[in-house]
């Protein structure tokens, strides 16, 4: 199926940013989640954390203003907001493990209906050798949100009944933000939050191949 209205990466990031509450401490993972820093709503204060040791991270700098000594965990140039700080990697992990992060936003290869997720290996040759800080965030953050495309390049759903890749965290994902829909997940399974225009609840169930509880006011 070809969806003309599917969200690009910037639109997914904007959708995530809409749900972040005022005053939240938020970790943005490597890859797609880093774009959330560029779409935070005006008028609220959100403190962004980066695993490599930044608190008070700002959006991407303008072209020509990059400082390559100031990068996020994905090695992308960022800015530092007033009051921001750099610190040791060990201090960063103490924040992550100690329950001080309200929300972590991570990418994933698979998320199960119960909120189990896999985001570090598909078993391919040359893949990264270990899980990294995502494991610490999955355990330490108060909520884990995932950003990803809903389908693989071959059309398989990344939302699954049970993960088949090496796991990152157990029953910790609460929201799944994709190019076609937003879902909540947990002990009661999947629930629809919204979809892109033109995608019906029935179409989404057919794509994912799993039961999805309807939302009271889902966008279609």
What name fits each language-model region?
Residues 1-81:
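N-terminal active-site beta-alpha-beta segment that forms phosphate/nucleotide-binding
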Residues 2-11, 62-220:
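Conserved phosphate- and dinucleotide-binding cores of soluble alpha/beta proteins
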């Amino acid at each position: 199926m070809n969806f003309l209205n599917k969200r690009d990466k910037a639109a997914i990031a904007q959708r995530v940013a809409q749900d972040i509450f005022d005053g939240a401490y938020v970790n943005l993972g490597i890859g797609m989640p880093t774009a959330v820093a560029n779409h935070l709503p005006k008028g609220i204060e959100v403190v962004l954390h980066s695993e490599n040791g930044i608190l008070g991270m700002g959006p991407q700098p303008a072209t020509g203003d990059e400082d390559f000594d100031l990068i996020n965990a994905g090695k992308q140039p960022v800015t530092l907001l007033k009051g921001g700080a750099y610190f040791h990697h060990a201090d960063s992990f103490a924040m992550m493990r100690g329950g001080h992060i309200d929300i972590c936003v991570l990418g994933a290869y698979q998320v199960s209906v119960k909120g189990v997720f896999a985001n570090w290996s598909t078993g391919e040759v040359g893949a990264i050798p270990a899980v990294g800080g995502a494991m610490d965030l999955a355990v330490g953050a108060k909520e884990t949100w995932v950003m990803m495309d809903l389908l693989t390049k071959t059309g398989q759903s990344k939302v699954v009944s049970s993960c088949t890749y090496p796991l990152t965290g157990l029953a910790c994902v609460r929201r799944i933000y994709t190019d076609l829909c937003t879902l909540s997940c947990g002990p009661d399974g999947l629930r629809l939050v919204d979809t892109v225009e033109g995608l019906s609840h029935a179409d989404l169930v057919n794509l994912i191949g799993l039961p999805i509880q309807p939302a009271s006011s889902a966008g279609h």
